Amino acid sequence: MKIACLHTAQSNVAIFDEAARALDLPQDALTHKVMPHLLEQAQAAGGVTPEIEKETIAALADLRTDADVVLLTCSTLGGAADFLAQDPGIMRVDRALAQATVTAGQPVVVLCAAPTTLHPTAALFRATLPQTTPLGVELIPDAWALFESGQHDAFHQRVAEAAQQAFARGAGCVALAQASMAGAERYFSHPKLLTCPRAALVQIAARIARERA
């Protein structure tokens, strides 16, 4: 199975490759396309504009022509994938993450780093989880500035600290809303700490297993 990933950060390439190796997916299963200007434009505009959405949809459709599955790995742009929702081969990784929280434990705390991710993430999780599930969607102060300045280790440490604090406050599970946050697992591990790359690739691995059965 060929899996094409559409990223807005180059650093996410290694994160997804690492997650694929951890799940024993074939070494050449993933291909990557990086379009950082999409997120840069969304941040400058204060959100996703129709033009950004249109370009994202076109990029997803183009990748789909040669891939069994296309993953949109940027949570800010996630809504663009919904325009192609009739195609089960196009996935937004944050939706896989939200689906994984349904049975992971309550209350659910979702941590975001980029301000532009906060609104689409909150909408997605509220739509996915049962109405009775306690849900908190939080922005980690100052984290995104670390990422944007290239201080990725400090960024992941800050995310890990926020996750640890959320569990200490009583979270049943903590979801890291952005793929770029997954590196926090190097600094803090917990069986109920969920990440986008793993959640999405677990779904795909399960699909592969069903097809082989």
Predicted feature locations:
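Non-catalytic structural scaffold of enzyme domains
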Residues: M1-A213
